[in-house]
Amino acid sequence: EQKTVLPLLEQLSQETGIPLVATNDAHYLTKEEAEMQQVLLCIQTGKTLDDPTALRFETEEFYLKSTQEMQTLFAAMPEAIANTKRIADRCHVELETGTLHLPAFSMEGVSDNIAFFQALCEKGMQKRYGTPVPEPVRNRLQRETQVIQQMGYVDYFLIVWDYVRYAKQHGIPVGPGRGSGAGSLCAYCMGITEIDPMAYHLLFERFLNPERVSMPDFDIDFCVEGRPAVKEYVIQKYGADRVTEIITFDFFKARGAIRDVGRVLHLPYAFCDQIAKKIDPRQTIAETLAAPDGKALQQLLHTNADAKKLLDLAQKIEGVPRHTSTHAAGVIISAIPLLEMVPLQKNEDTIVTQYPMGDLETLGFLKFDFLGLRNLTIIRNCVRMIQETEPHFSIHHIPITDAAVYQMMANGDTMGVFQFESAGMRHVLLQMQPKCLEDLTAALSLYRPGPRDSIPQYLENRKHPDSISYAHPLLKPILEVTYGCMVYQEQVMEICRSLAGYSYGRADVVRRAMSKKKQEVMEQERQTFLYGLDGVCSGAIQNGVPKAVAESIFDEISRFAAYAFNKSHAVRLCLSGISKNRQNTLWNFYTGLKPETIQSKRLEKRSVRMKEPATHT
């Protein structure tokens, strides 16, 4: 077809005077990837390679050709090649980085945002703590406001404060705080969060500090039915061209790639599934083949042609984006029209960025998390039912020290309570017999891969606190609250600070590196932890910690940091759990879990939830 069309295009160019341009219709990078492209087409369309009706390219020429190849192909039309180069030379894109595209907060009657921010914090501090304000609280607030102003995030706090205020004013339930943002005293005083960071020893530096590389973000929970209204408020305030949701990419992983390629090759599912299960889900196909445990798979590769074909093609598509979706909560609010710097597309009924969050952050765009939480909807429904007989009831009237609530938790009566309803967690609660919020926070943080192995030790230490021994006396004030066990990310930071002299900011950077298991960074940090670093910290040995003890402690925090839980987030989950488990509202609570509310297809699980209140009548 091209051989027929090209002479006609050349003739049309001569007749109209419109210059010719040589183009390269490229769908893949190299000629060798033609088969991979066909496999991807078949996966996308649900076809097999041997299906005569499958969409396919007729040649293997749809790859990105070199300059020499293009010049050879268009040897008879050198002016077309020259025109292509002229266009390319005129294309020049520089994406600015290092500038924060955060809109300036505006509100009628507010002319100085910094002064307004400080006034909100001061007024909120007096409301939360009374007068005179305790000195540690005032000092903490002063430190936080200085960091926030220094790093240029005053408008960020005000923007979040504004849409949280809007939600509360319009009767949309808002969560008490999620993630590291709950560690901010400023956020608590402004009413963004409802968790007192002073009472629960939460660290602001876990959320924001001058040494932090990545941008902070508040994760705010809204009633799932009210979330669209809050987002619409933001769109109306800042402009539809400056507010958008964020794309996410789902990539082919090893096991999924094997199963998908197997379908395309028309191989038996059982055969493909057997091979897929030989791949360690934490590894790539190549890593599994190179590992000692991969010898059986290597042998199959050399003796079975179907297996070789399957794995060869699966490795080619492994790591390739499979499809796109929309970030569950993230929203960009920009100071400039987004199309000036960001390509956009439509995902179903939503406009989203074509850049994922990491690239958006590099370009200076901040993410605001609007999470739709069905549990808040359930709590709202319960409150409305309670108010039919107790008109003045408020969720904020539930004391977090209510012994009856903790007794229910200790009895394992937590069906339908988010994060506490699994059989394993109920078993932990029965063993632990929680008496306070700190107990629930520890239970929630321990019951996850990694720390779960520490549960028996934690329970034993809790029974016999006098028998707990610490590797070094400096660990006692940090780990005493969790009976000698490391439970929270914040404890990792405190250990680095107390033993080795780290700043909180530096300690958070180290925690992040450990959580990502960056071996080179961790080995470098080991030396810093032990021996210190000029201008950074003194090191544990200089602070009087024996070398062997310091090495042992660093090894322990390195292992633990990969699985450690954020205490700020754990406290928020526990407060929500307490709100949902108030003893004298059981019937209302379980009625709030009615099928149309939870939208569950698991009928047998739903019936358990609906029957359980009968045991408390």
Task: Identify the function of each model-found stretch.
Residues E1-T617:
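Alpha-helical scaffold/interaction cores of sigma-54-like transcription cofactors
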